[in-house]
From Swiss-Prot:
Pfam families in the record: DUF441
GO cellular component: plasma membrane
Superkingdom in the source lineage: Bacteria
Protein name per UniProt: UPF0756 membrane protein A1S_2121
Length: 150
């Protein structure tokens, strides 16, 4: 009986429940989709999802961030003004720092997969319990890389 016990499925179910209890749609939907994939023949796509899911997620996030520019909601004038406002210059600097940390995080997660579980647990807990957003693993890994010198 223990041989049939799937710890990973239980973890996904716990995440689904945490997402539901915290009313976090991102965690709920992600866990639900992964459960469906896991228990159906769709599980053959896990290698593809693992290989390309992060890049696809970053692409979708980038599209979401750039949409106000494309739609005209963020005018060219306000974009140009961002280079003369102190607050906007600080925002640009922080954006550069976070992008750099995310890049370090991707490298660390690729080279040291043993830290991925801890980063994921912390990120999911932050999303489910603290109303965070799931961009945390990359930034967390980038910060970790600064502490461990990788």
């Amino acid at each position: 009986m223990l041989a049939q016990f799937d710890v990973n499925l239980v973890v996904l179910l716990v995440l689904l429940i945490c997402g539901l209890l915290s009313q976090n749609a991102a965690v709920t939907i992600a866990a639900g989709i992964l459960i469906v994939i896991k228990i159906t023949p769709l599980n053959q796509f896990f290698p593809y999802i693992q290989a390309h899911g992060l890049n696809l997620g970053i692409l979708i996030l980038t599209i979401g961030v750039l949409t106000p520019i494309a739609s005209g909601k963020l005018s060219g004038e306000s974009i140009l003004k961002s280079f003369i406002s102190f607050k906007s210059l600080v925002a640009i600097a922080i954006g550069l720092l976070v992008a750099w940390l995310g890049g370090r995080g991707v490298k660390l997660m690729s080279s040291q997969p043993d830290v991925v579980a801890g980063l994921l647990i912390g990120t999911v807990a932050g999303v489910a319990l603290l109303r965070g957003v799931p961009v945390g693993p990359l930034i967390a890994a980038g910060l970790l890389s600064l502490f461990i010198g990788k």
